[in-house]
């Protein structure tokens, strides 16, 4: 009987991401991953680790150095430590999966990339939203050509909520652009084709956060030959109606959320033939009129199945299944680090445009 190779995992950080996301996901893939070490600075959390996992928890990630029973280290430390700790791990011979944001700045991420290259290690960033079922379905629909050429994508992450934890503090590499932004930014750059010549507009504000970081972000990305991308992250809008996914196309459009998508489009062969008219439009009795036609529109929808509907879970499992293939067979991983680097450059430009907020 064929037995899958298990990836032996060390997890740094046992908080909301480490315990509630990464541990929860990997416990659902027991044939592919197993935990062999945990690292947590908080004493009470270390006791929790030992109760819940039966594994002794370490206080310092440097206690992992020299061990040969670890295939992958998941770095779910504080955001401001992601790049520094990843660099140390890579330089000491470990393959690393880091939580987002990959870094608080471009320079530190480039240092980590250099360490990975110099030491022959693999370095991944947890951008699991690329694997969200609704996002992948949206990409499939656009690729079919039914909507024509996409003119604009809009990605909305809106809600109405106050926040007062450490992830509201700008100096902790936090705020909405770094906390939430990596997900819609990853989508936007993906649909744009990751152009290097990209124009960035970004407006930020503080609505009711208790820290000095932003909790409102409006970002517009443009590049030659690419669709416009409109990203909105707001903690100040509590009404529905602003779907997560929107596509404006030359022959149709799409809208929806993780709970379902709907799209409509017309087929060229079914559309009434029209020609440009430069004289004023009128009826036979000379009454002025607007353009008007009966344009047959086809409407379709997609509803996720039971597993796809558990989006928070399914996109993470999709990510870890793809990562497993990369680690065990050498299959190319979908998300490349030069894509993450581009995202960080745009993030730096966004903060530069709003520097007065953080003086």
Regions flagged by a language model, labelled:
Residues 1-4, 11, 72-74, 294, ...:
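C-terminal helix-rich "cap/oligomerization" subdomain common to oxidoreductases
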Residues 1-53:
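N-terminal Rossmann-like dinucleotide-binding module
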Residues 55-115, 315-318:
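Beta-loop-alpha module in the N-terminal Rossmann-like domain of NAD(P)-dependent dehydrogenases
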Residues 59, 75, 98, 123-125, ...:
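Hydrophobic residues in well-ordered beta-strands that form the structural core
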Residues 111-128, 149-153:
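Rossmann-fold dehydrogenase core element
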Residues 129-210:
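Predominantly a Rossmann-like dinucleotide-binding segment in NAD(P)-dependent oxidoreductases
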Residues 179, 185-270, 317-332, 347-349:
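Contiguous beta-strand/loop segments that form the cofactor/metal-binding neighborhood of enzyme cores
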Residues 267-307:
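Charged, glycine/proline-rich intrinsically disordered loops and linkers
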């Amino acid at each position: 009987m064929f037995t899958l190779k298990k990836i032996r995992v060390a997890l740094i950080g046992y908080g909301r991401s480490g315990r509630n996301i990464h541990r929860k996901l990997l416990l659902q893939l027991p044939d592919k991953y197993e935990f062999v070490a945990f690292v947590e600075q908080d004493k009470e959390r270390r006791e929790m680790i030992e109760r819940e996992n039966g594994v002794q928890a370490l206080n310092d990630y440097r206690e992992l150095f020299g061990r040969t029973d670890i295939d992958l280290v998941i770095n779910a430390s504080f955001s401001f430590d992601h790049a520094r700790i990843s660099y140390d791990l890579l330089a000491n011979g470990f393959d690393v999966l880091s939580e987002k944001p990959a870094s608080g700045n471009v320079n530190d991420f480039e240092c980590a990339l250099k360490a990975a290259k110099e030491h022959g290690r693999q370095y991944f960033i947890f951008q699991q939203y690329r694997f969200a079922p609704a996002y992948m379905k949206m990409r499939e629909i656009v690729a079919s050509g039914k909507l024509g050429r996409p003119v604009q994508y809009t990605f909305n992450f809106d809600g109405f909520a106050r926040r007062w934890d450490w992830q509201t503090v700008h100096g902790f590499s936090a705020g909405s652009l770094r906390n939430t932004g990596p997900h819609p930014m990853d989508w936007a750059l993906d649909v744009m084709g990751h152009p290097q010549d990209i124009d960035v507009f970004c407006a930020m504000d503080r609505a009711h956060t208790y820290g000095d970081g932003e909790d409102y972000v409006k970002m517009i990305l443009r590049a030659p030959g690419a669709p416009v991308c409109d990203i909105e992250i707001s903690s100040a809008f509590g009404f529905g109606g602003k779907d997560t996914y929107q596509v404006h196309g030359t022959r149709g459009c799409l809208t929806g959320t993780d709970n379902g998508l709907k799209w409509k489009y017309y087929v060229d062969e079914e559309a009434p033939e029209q020609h440009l008219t430069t004289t004023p439009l009128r009826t036979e009795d000379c009454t002025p009129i607007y353009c008007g036609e009966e344009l047959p529109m086809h409407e379709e929808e997609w509803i996720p199945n039971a597993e796809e509907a558990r989006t928070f879970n399914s996109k993470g499992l999709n990510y870890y299944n793809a990562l497993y293939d990369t680690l065990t067979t050498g299959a190319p991983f979908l998300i490349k680090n030069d894509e993450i680097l581009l995202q960080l450059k745009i993030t730096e430009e966004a903060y530069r445009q709003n520097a007065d907020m953080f003086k």
